[in-house]
A protein has these predicted regions:
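Short, flexible N-terminal segments of the mature chain
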Residues: 18-43
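Generic structural hydrophobic/aromatic packing signal, biased to beta-strands
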Residues: 6-8, 22, 37, 79
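Short, charged/polar N-terminal "headpieces" of proteins
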Residues: 1-18
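Residue-identity detector for threonine
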Residues: 8-11, 28, 50-52
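Acidic, low-complexity intrinsically disordered segments
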Residues: 36-86
Length: 86
């Protein structure tokens, strides 16, 4: 399964930067990827932080590893935590 990767940088409430990828099916609208990112922010205690197309930008399409594919099929998305994530 191919997946679309949205590279995301959000300023946390403490001023530090949170870097993560929102990974979805390639046909998923950009706006929906942003919604998924906001859901992750809420779950991470960062609800209300700014997340727009500026913070969440399309990066590339790649083959999804099994764990990513399973998450996308169950939840519609997968979050790949990079830096500053809980």
């Amino acid at each position: 399964m191919e997946c679309a990767v949205y590279d995301t940088y959000v300023t946390k409430k403490d001023g530090r930067v949170m870097h993560f990828d929102v990974i979805v099916e390639p046909s998923t609208p950009h706006e929906k990827a942003i919604e998924y990112g906001k859901e992750y922010l809420k779950d991470s205690g960062q609800d209300g932080q700014t997340m727009t197309q500026e913070e969440c930008q399309f990066c590339h399409v790649q083959e999804a590893p099994k764990v990513v594919e399973d998450s996308i099929q169950q939840n519609g998305y997968f979050i790949q935590k990079m830096e500053g994530c809980p």
